[in-house]
Amino acid sequence: MTTALAEGIDAAKGNFRRTAEALSTEIAPLATETDAVGIDRYRLASRQFVGTTVDLAETYEWGKQELARIEQLQRETAERIRPGASIKEAMAVLDADPAYQITGTAALKVWMQERADEAISSLDGTHFEVPEQARHIEGMIAPTHDGGVYYTPPSDDFSRPGRMWWSVPDDANTFTTWRELTTVYHEGAPGHHLQTSSAIAAREELNSWRRNYWTSGYGEGWALYAEWLMADLGYMDDPGHFMGLLDGQSMRAARVVLDIGLHCQFEAPEEMGGGEWNWDKAWAVSYTHLTLPTSDLV
């Protein structure tokens, strides 16, 4: 056993060494000197990612308009939270409000499960016909600690239900629900859980690959639309929860602007100084519209 383990370690070391050599001697010389991949490569990659040809210039302009629209909604919502408050000041008010705080991962799991169950119960028979198999979802605390939230679909026979997983950082013990109700709707119902579980349940109408296949543009597009839909249906009337929705949507719109603008070498927004994209302009967009710790932005 010891000999086999040592041989396996040596083999792995050799493979890593050969990979490093190939990257430095074969791949690195082919790399471009600029951060931008260029519009041709980006167009090809976006087609694979979204599933259709994207007019990148048009989408870039849409992203800038969407970012401005969301920022205006954030200002209006900040005024509802505390008259005269800026967006960041309103978020600080929400962070300090005990009404939006949960302590401990056990309480977080209960809150997540209750919100997901409530959404399915209230949507079923009113706005959606939720298949019986899809009416159950499990809220889980993930064994990892990177801070993300994600969804895993049910097994084909539903013996394993769909699950939302919350990856809680090691040092986190207090959670702010105003940011996260929209996440429950994104990952649960009417988001990914309704999306994938409904497809998997349609055994009589869809073959296996149509029930299980995933493309990011369709999959994430559904879940992002689900967040706005819940606002339209009145589930996000609370200004704190609506600010949470806007916070997440602002991040997505900012990424559209930054990613397309930088890689396709479009002119930077006027409020960022115009001209070519550079580190300072990318940082300005990120810092302004992505309310993440500085360590996550760098």
For each of these PLM feature ranges, what is it?
Residues 1-290, 295:
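N-terminal maturation segment of proteins
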